[in-house]
Amino acid sequence: MKNSIMDTKFDRRILLLNKIIIVFIVLMTLLPLLPLLYIVVASFMDPKVLVSRGISFNPADWTVEGYQRVFSDQSILRGFINSLLYSFGFAALTVLLSVFTAYPLSKKDLVGRRWINYFLIVTMFFGGGLVPTYLLVKELGMLNTPWAIIVPVAVNVWNIILARAYFQGLPEELVEAAVIDGANDLQIFFKIMLPLAKPIMFVLFLYAFVGQWNSYFDAMIYIKDPNLEPLQLVLRKILIQSQPGQDMIGAQAAMNEMKRLADLIKYATIVISSLPLIVMYPFFQKYFDKGIMAGSLKG
């Protein structure tokens, strides 16, 4: 009887402990979402109300003035389309070059494999420099063209290493069976290896897309035509233009109003620039987890 009572008390303690752990895990999971929630809500709120009372879910305190100001600029849509084209084009080219380079390097019988790997690793530590890269892009006639954003950084050694590790993790018996069936190297690569490499290809695509989407420095250097500017560069210009100027220092009311609009525009641009990545990530989630785990098995 005593043992039964003790077991019941022990079970209750275990159940209570499990509930506490679950609540803790849920809170830790939701914690990273707080900054995102703050930015989204702040983009709809008057900065004066936000500073004085904090985040409010009362519709009376909300405003869409920041989004109206941003979308009233016709360059936003043009920059959004440009960023999509640059990001998709860059990501697709990066994935193709990475897997085409990684697969041969995953084969131990490749002549000069070690020296090629050393050469690639050296480029991770020593870059060509900004000025030589600019001169090369200029000599190739890519200045003020989309190719200046896509081509110079299309080869990423880290992506090649991830893809190589993934190919090394695939069973060698697949290749041996294909050779017995009469398949040549190209058939093995395109009909067997590429379909099996979908997880790592999606991971590399996501990495490249996010990196290019958030980039504005290359466009700032190589692009002078406003019609070719990506979204990040357009938003950067809008933020700079929305800041109070030196001529407003004497006009306190005008400066305060400009500061209020600048804060609204800042939060709105963060939401606009982050939205495509947030929408795209759930569709890549299953490939992302699988590709990362498989790509980390071998080096």
For each predicted feature, which ranges?
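A hydrophobic, multi-pass inner-membrane permease signature
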Residues: 2-299
